[in-house]
A protein has these predicted regions:
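Positively charged n-region of N-terminal signal peptides that target proteins for export
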Residues: 1-8
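C-terminal motif of bacterial Sec signal peptides marking the signal peptidase cleavage site
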Residues: 15-19
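Repetitive helical segments and hydrophobic/amphipathic motifs
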Residues: 11-12
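Soluble, non-membrane globular domain cores that form compact, hydrophobic packing
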Residues: 21-85, 91-176
């Protein structure tokens, strides 16, 4: 009887482990606007984009193939001094990685060849592209570093912390 009980407990335990190890693909039903708004909310008054991007910007500036995009919401600052921008794309099923690669290339191009005010270089360099499944975000956001005596390293660290606010808000939507 004892051997049967031990055997049953072992079988039940193995069954539980097998059930836990099955990877379930979590699906989300956010619009690009939902994700955009969550990131915007995380920044509060430090969210500077106040104008919408248009399809020409999506395709020319960012190189997006709109046939791979199901939904998109993007904003940019209308004051040219600030580089702040947020682009959130919900790619068509299975196209998330492709959209991510395209936005990474656009980011790299902006970092390497963009004409930026020196005060904005840290923010531009700290920008990130993040992805969760078929949702992708290009994040170049954050408070303005008002310190006039900040070293290059301090400015870079401040900018990284500011961009991370958006990354964390994005990731929070997709945590299991």
């Amino acid at each position: 009887m004892k051997k049967i009980s031990v055997f049953l407990v072992l079988c039940l335990s193995l069954g539980l482990f097998a059930a836990c190890s099955k990877e379930e693909e979590k699906t989300y039903d956010y619009t690009a606007g939902d994700v955009y708004d969550a990131i915007k909310e995380a920044y509060g008054e430090d969210f500077l984009p106040d104008g919408d991007m248009n399809e020409e910007e999506y395709t020319v500036t960012y190189g997006l193939d709109m046939d791979k995009v199901e939904d998109i919401k993007a904003g940019i600052t209308m004051i040219s001094f600030h580089p702040d921008r947020l682009l959130v794309a919900k790619a068509k099923e299975g196209e998330g990685e492709s959209v991510e690669e395209t936005l990474e290339a656009a980011r790299d191009n902006m970092v390497e060849t963009g004409m930026w005010y020196p005060a904005n270089l840290a923010k531009v360099n700290a920008s990130q592209v993040v992805r969760a499944g078929d949702y992708v975000a290009f994040i170049m956001l954050g408070a303005v570093d008002e310190r006039e005596d900040a070293t290059e390293e301090e400015a870079a660290e401040f900018a990284k912390e500011q961009v991370q606010i958006g990354v964390d808000a994005f990731n929070a939507l997709f945590e299991e």
